[in-house]
């Protein structure tokens, strides 16, 4: 066998082997078409369909940084330096349609950090303010809502003014476990009934931080509202099962123009003490009022004043300025006069304080 024959035989063997391997080769399947995310506009901006479902999802929230100086207008004490705090709030909302109505969920997870004027981590003034908390988590089917949310005593009539220090004179506890049902008519009328567990994170006159029910009897809240293009009027009544007392609020909002609106709220408590779940103002009664003026597309001026039966007066004003869409800077100044029965609970009768808030919402 000569060299030429050997080379020809080797080449033939290689060709045959290559043909056999080609016959046995695995053919990769064609890639499946990608199903792009679909926009869902049934529940507002920012929702999209979860792929493969008819459920709409929205991820939103905000990042906030606050700097406070001057006096603490809630306690009257002198800060003697800057208090700083930061928060990242992550919110997830879902919505879908069912044979029983719209099914929604809402959750909010808050990551908080604070440092007081001495630079001590975890402190904001005299309070511990760092940590992570599941602030809200509820399910809603039609008008039925169950889970952790804010009390209907607050939300049904509407929050106080668009100021940061809005609750120097408190209008009641906020977060609570609850089962509520809201009826909404087509003529502007609505009504609510709620069974609530009681607040768990609000301090009262004596420093109490837990207003949970202590048995099987829940707190009960009921309210009525009428709303139109001119504004709204609402009333709410709450029964505190722990102290077996009740509190009530009535509020009116009026839209003077498209840019200018005013509101007024009055409240009464049968217990006449702020150390309770609902009527947390001083004495029998309290009154709040405020206004909002949208000066330009970017700047809004807000003013709020309040006074209670025990003699506390609180006034706050701010300007919320949107530098760019989603980023707002709010400088605010507040004044509190501790008169009457409040004078014995604070170090100073008069308190002036300021805060600047930087917030990016998305």
From Swiss-Prot:
Keywords: Cell outer membrane, Ion transport, Membrane, Porin, Signal, Transmembrane, Transmembrane beta strand, Transport. SUPFAM superfamilies: Porins. It is found in: Cell outer membrane. GO terms for molecular function: porin activity. It is a multi-pass membrane protein. GO terms for biological process: monoatomic ion transport. GO terms for cellular component: cell outer membrane; pore complex. Residues 1-22 form the signal peptide. The keyword Transport applies. Consists of 16-stranded beta-barrel sheets, with large surface-exposed loops, that form a transmembrane pore at the center of each barrel. The pore is partially ocluded by a peptide loop that folds into the pore lumen. Forms passive diffusion pores that allow small molecular weight hydrophilic materials across the outer membrane. The pore formed by Omp2a is larger than the one formed by Omp2b. Omp2b pores have optimal permeability to allow growth and protection against harmful compounds. The larger pore formed by Omp2a may be advantageous for intracellular growth, when the bacterium is competing with the host cell for nutrients whose concentration is particularly low within the phagosome. Homotrimer. This is Porin Omp2b. It comes from Brucella canis (strain ATCC 23365 / NCTC 10854 / RM-666).
């Amino acid at each position: 066998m000569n060299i030429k024959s050997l080379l020809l035989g080797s080449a033939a063997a290689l060709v045959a082997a290559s043909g056999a391997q080609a016959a046995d080769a695995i053919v990769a399947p064609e890639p499946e078409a990608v199903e792009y995310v679909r926009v869902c506009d049934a529940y507002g901006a920012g929702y999209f369909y979860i792929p493969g479902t008819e459920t709409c999802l929205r991820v939103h929230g905000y990042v906030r940084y606050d700097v406070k100086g001057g006096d603490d207008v809630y306690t009257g004490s002198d800060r003697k330096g800057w208090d700083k705090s930061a928060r990242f709030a992550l919110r997830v909302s879902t919505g879908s349609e069912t044979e029983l109505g719209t099914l929604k969920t809402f959750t909010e997870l808050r990551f908080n950090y604070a440092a007081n004027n001495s630079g001590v981590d975890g402190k904001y003034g005299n309070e511990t303010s760092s940590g992570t908390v599941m602030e809200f988590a509820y399910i809603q089917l039609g008008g039925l809502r169950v889970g952790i949310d804010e009390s209907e005593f607050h939300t049904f009539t509407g929050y106080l003014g668009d100021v940061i220090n809005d609750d120097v004179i408190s209008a009641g506890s906020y977060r609570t476990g609850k089962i509520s049902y809201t009826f909404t008519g087509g003529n502007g009328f609505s009504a609510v009934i709620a069974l609530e567990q009681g607040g768990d994170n609000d301090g009262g006159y004596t420093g109490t931080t837990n207003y949970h029910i202590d048995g099987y009897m829940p707190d009960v809240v009921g309210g009525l509202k009428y709303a139109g293009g001119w504004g709204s009027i609402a009333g709410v009544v709450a029964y505190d099962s722990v102290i077996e007392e009740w509190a009530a609020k009535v509020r009116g909002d009026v839209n003077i123009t498209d840019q200018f609106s005013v509101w007024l709220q009055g409240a009464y408590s049968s217990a006449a003490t702020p150390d309770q779940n609902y009527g947390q103002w001083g004495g029998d009664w309290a009154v709040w009022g405020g206004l909002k003026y949208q000066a330009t597309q970017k700047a809004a001026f807000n003013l709020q004043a309040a006074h209670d039966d025990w003699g506390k007066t609180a006034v706050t004003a701010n300007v919320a300025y949107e530098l760019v869409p989603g980023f707002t800077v709010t400088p605010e100044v507040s004044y509190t006069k501790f008169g009457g029965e409040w004078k014995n609970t604070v170090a100073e009768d008069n308190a002036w304080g300021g805060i600047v808030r930087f917030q990016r919402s998305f």
